[in-house]
Every structure is written in structure tokens, then in C-alpha cells.
Design a protein with these regions (language model features):
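Positively charged n-region of N-terminal signal peptides that target proteins for export
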Residues: 1-5
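Bacterial N-terminal signal peptides
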Residues: 7-17
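Alpha-helical structural motif
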Residues: 9, 26-30, 230
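Short, intrinsically disordered, charge-balanced linker/junction segments flanking boundaries
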Residues: 17, 22, 237-238
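N-terminal mature ectodomain segment of secretory-pathway/periplasmic proteins
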Residues: 23-116
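Gly/Pro-enriched, hydrophobic low-complexity segments
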Residues: 32, 86, 97, 109-113, ...
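Short, solvent-exposed loop/turn segments that connect beta-strands within catalytic domains
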Residues: 54-57, 72-77, 104-106, 160-164, ...
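Short amphipathic beta-strand and strand-loop transition segments with alternating hydrophobic
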Residues: 64-73, 151-160, 220-222
Length: 238
């Protein structure tokens, strides 16, 4: 599947350079290029999630993410990712498994293991707009959203974000996919600031259907690691 991440994805984004000059690229070309980043055939990431409430109280959650690509029936790749929470003690052993199928007609398969209950909960497609482990991220923010569900347009073809020149691109569900897209994401529309140099999402915002609020995403601590542009810090605020 070709996907984009409203939140830039929890495992970071990597550089992919499409053919053609910047002037020739359409908004769809750019979002497809963001999706087609090289991230290797397998990866292991150590992450820390910090939840901050309205009283500025913080809760820290440490997790490790394992991701691996497998050959698909079409000759492309299916991706399986396992997120394993290591701390704090009350959620240690909680695991989230996602199968991202190459077949665009097939929805992701996702499961959440809750050790305190010793049960596995299947995440239905109608639940992917729910909060992921009490955070401002949803399952859809983490898994990604189908590019083909959306029409993309330029809001601004040149805008600076922290000194980085970006395209500002808006995503609105196509009429034929509107109900499915809104159910899966909980968003009526999204906007992304994409770096013209690295094709990383520097900033994003999503209009929530519930509560009529806007969710804001910000990427920071961007580093070139082993010739790969990597986002090391990602913030979501609702």
C-alpha cells in the first residue's frame, strides 16, 4: 500500500528523492515520494513516549519497535511491525502488532496484547481513529493512511518552517472514499509541511471530527544518520 502519515510516523521518516524538478512535481507526487522513503528491509527502534496532561504532569513510556518487510504476492512487500512496551511496570509487556499489506484492497490487520488481562484485542478498522495507549496519537497516525483515498492540493508552494523551505499540502478525502477515510482516521482534512530538501514532514495538522478540534504535529531533532534523514522527536498536541 502507498501511505502517508499525518504525524510523520512514530519510527521517523527517511529521505527519498523523486525524479523531476520541484517545479514539475504535483502534490500527489510529493506525498507519494514521502511514502517511498528508504527505511531498509528491517529495523529496530528504541523510543520514549512522554504524555503531558493539562496540568503539565508527565508520564513516560519506553518501547521498542521491530519492523520487517516480507515478499508479497504481487512481488512487492508486506510490512509487519511490533511495538513492545518495556516500562513503566504497569504496562510492561503490552504489545501492538500491525500487518501492513501491499494489496491496496486489503485493510491492515492489527492486534493489541494486554498482559494485565492476558488477552489479545483485535483493532478493527472502525477503531483506528482511537487513541494509541492513551496518547494524542491514534492507530491511524502510527499505521499510516492510504494515499489513494485523498485528493492533494497546494496551499502554499513555498513556506518556511524553522528556516526550512517547505510545500504546504492539503489532503481532503475523495468523495468515493470519504466515509471510509473519516472512519479510519477521525479527520475531515489534513495539512502537511513537506521539506523540499529532505521530503520530511516538518509540521502537520489534522481537523478532528470529534470535538471539532485541530491536532498539531511537530517534527524536531532531525539528523542525517548513515546518510538517512531521520526525525528523532515528534510532538502531537490536541
Amino acid at each position: 500500500m502507498s501511505k502517508f502519515f499525518p504525524s510523520a510516523g512514530l519510527v521517523g521518516l527517511f529521505l527519498f528523492c523523486p525524479s523531476g524538478t520541484a517545479a514539475e512535481l504535483t502534490p500527489h507526487d510529493i506525498m507519494y515520494a514521502v511514502d517511498q522513503r528508504y527505511d531498509g528491509d528491517s529495523s529496530i527502534s528504541e523510543m520514549t513516549m512522554v504524555l503531558i496532561d493539562r496540568r503539565d504532569r508527565q508520564r513516560r513510556r519506553d518501547l521498542r519497535i521491530y519492523s520487517k518487510d516480507f515478499p508479497s504476492a504481487s512481488g512487492d512487500e508486506d510490512t509487519r511491525a511490533l511495538s513492545l512496551f518495556e516500562s513503566p511496570a504497569d504496562i510492561r509487556g503490552t504489545a501492538y502488532l500491525n500487518f501492513d499489506w501491499d494489496d491496496s484492497e486489503r485493510d491492515d490487520d492489527s492486534w493489541l496484547y494486554l498482559p494485565s488481562l492476558q488477552r489479545v484485542k483485535r483493532i478493527a478498522s472502525s477503531d483506528t481513529s482511537d487513541s494509541f495507549m492513551g496518547s494524542d496519537f491514534t492507530y491511524a497516525d502510527i499505521n499510516g493512511i492510504e494515499i489513494e483515498w485523498y485528493d492533494f492540493s497546494f496551499i502554499n508552494e513555498s513556506e518556511l518552517v524553522d528556516g526550512v523551505e517547505c510545500w504546504l499540502i492539503e489532503a481532503i478525502p475523495k468523495t468515493e472514499f470519504k466515509d471510509k477515510a473519516e472512519e479510519a482516521t477521525g479527520y475531515s482534512k489534513m495539512q502537511s509541511w513537506i521539506s523540499k530538501e529532505s521530503y520530511l514532514q516538518m509540521r502537520g495538522q489534522a481537523w478532528e471530527l470529534r470535538g471539532n478540534r485541530i491536532k498539531y504535529f511537530t517534527s524536531s531533532e532531525i539528523e542525517l544518520i548513515d546518510d538517512v534523514w531521520t526525525i528523532k522527536s515528534l510532538q502531537a498536541i490536541t
